[in-house]
Regions:
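Phosphate/pyrophosphate-binding loops and the adjoining catalytic core of nucleotide-dependent enzymes
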Residues: 228
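Eukaryotic acidic, serine/threonine-rich low-complexity intrinsically disordered regions
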Residues: 183-187, 192, 196, 202-204
Length: 274
């Protein structure tokens, strides 16, 4: 074997050793999959909701600090593995069901006609392995709100949470979500939605009010969800697609001077300008 060949072989072997060492080191630094999640356990607990017209669900974003007390980031609680179901309250009474372990991280308080459900995960309530995570993934059983008739507006700003609304029959209701929402087997005379991504799966809404600023997407299952009139609200320039069979008519409701809507139609339609 020539000397040059020995040199090349040695360089390749050295490189392989370095790569293997790097992979081993990285594997010791990565948090295990099970450690990514904060599991919140306990028996199911149901509490009665106080009289209110508005329910807000929010999560505190705590500061992550260095050992010297300097701020190095913000911890974001993520509810991707902690879904929320909204059902109808019985006899006008509302309730909230959740895993009892959540009591350590949750408070409920009323201000005027608004009930605030606040989730907070400060360092003094977390094990060391969670304290430096910028993205705190939560995992627990489904939370359920039995919504009483007197609640007119439900707002949830919980990151990555999937909300399902099932079996509601209401004259009117307003809903705002942070991420994902599905409507199943509901009947509304008027439904207003804001933010997030929406699937109108089964049921009907005679009047569907969509605030386009903040809504990432919406999809109406025309085979099983009926909409008579869609009202589209927006500031600035907006565009959307009206799918075949999505609704009977659309009403454009500009919210600022110069607001415009670029709408793509998937079936024959009549445009009436007032």
């Amino acid at each position: 074997m020539k000397r040059t060949t020995y040199i090349i072989f040695g360089m390749l072997l050295t490189g392989l050793v370095v790569v293997c060492a790097g992979i081993f080191y990285a594997s010791t630094q990565v948090t295990g999959w099970d450690n990514i999640f904060l599991d919140i356990k306990g028996e199911k607990k149901t509490v009665q909701l106080p009289q209110c017209r508005v329910i807000q669900m929010v999560a505190v974003r705590n500061i992550i600090a260095t050992g010297e007390g300097e701020e190095k980031g913000i911890r974001m609680p993520a509810f991707g593995e902690l879904p929320l179901k909204i059902t109808s309250g019985e006899a006008g009474q509302g309730s909230f069901t959740y895993a009892s372990g959540m009591d350590e991280f949750m408070t409920m308080n009323s201000v005027g006609d608004t009930l605030r459900i606040v989730f907070d995960f400060p360092n003094d309530k977390l094990e060391k392995k969670y304290q430096d995570l910028y993205w705190l993934n939560l995992r627990s059983e489904e939370m359920i709100i039995a919504l009483p008739d007197h609640v007119q507006f439900l707002q949830t700003s919980l990151e990555a949470q999937k909300m399902t609304v099932e079996g509601l029959a209401r004259d009117s209701l307003s809903l705002m979500v942070q991420d994902y929402a599905t409507i199943n087997d509901c009947n509304f005379r008027a439904l207003t939605v804001q933010n997030g991504a929406w699937l109108f799966n089964t049921g009907k809404a005679d009047n569907l009010h969509l605030h386009l600023n903040g809504i990432r997407s919406w999809n109406v299952n025309a085979n099983s969800f009926h909409v008579d009139t869609e009202y589209l609200y927006a500031h600035g320039d907006q565009r959307c697609t009206l799918e075949k069979g999505e609704c009977r008519q659309v009403v454009w409701m500009p919210q600022s001077e110069g607001a415009s809507l670029d709408i793509k139609l998937k079936e024959a339609a009549t445009v009436v300008v007032k």
